[in-house]
Amino acid sequence: MGTLILDSMVNKEAVLREAPPGTILVTVGDVTSERISGFGMTPLLQIIDGKTRRAAHEPAGPPPDVEIIRCENPAGGISPECIETIRRALGSSSPLRLVVSGEEDLLVIPACIYAPDGAVIMYGQPGRGLVAIHVDAGIRYKAKGLLDSVS
């Protein structure tokens, strides 16, 4: 699901083509969240777990206007707690950083379900680049099917 921006092509302009100013943006993954923040962009929701490719990663501190929230999520799964936390976070008007105890990889799925139409979810594809998912009813339907298969 989504559009791949190759690693060699990831820059602020490429990201802005996918998520122009005013777009609700969600980032999933430590490196993706740091890259987007490094371009001077503040996602509505950053989902991180303090790991990159399963190795410990010390995330950069969030900007002062970004509130930290937390949830626990098992590796290879999606916890009801994280689903509810993401649902509530995407109803917020203030930027949030969700720090996951466990693994955040599959949390792109509930982000796609609860983000509004027109939102963009970005996550990293290791060794390939950055994936941008443009949320609409079709993406939401696919994400719900994936959630059912994981649950």
Curated annotation (Swiss-Prot):
Keywords: Coenzyme A biosynthesis, GTP-binding, Kinase, Nucleotide-binding, Transferase. GTP binds at residues 30-31, 49, 51, 104. Its EC number is 2.7.1.237. Pathway: Cofactor biosynthesis; coenzyme A biosynthesis. GO terms for molecular function: GTP binding; kinase activity. InterPro entries: GTP-dep_dephospho-CoA_kin. Pfam families: DUF359 (PF04019). The keyword GTP-binding applies. The keyword Kinase applies. GO terms for biological process: coenzyme A biosynthetic process. It catalyses: 3'-dephospho-CoA + GTP = GDP + CoA + H(+). Catalyzes the GTP-dependent phosphorylation of the 3'-hydroxyl group of dephosphocoenzyme A to form coenzyme A (CoA). Belongs to the GTP-dependent DPCK family. This is GTP-dependent dephospho-CoA kinase. It comes from Cenarchaeum symbiosum (strain A).
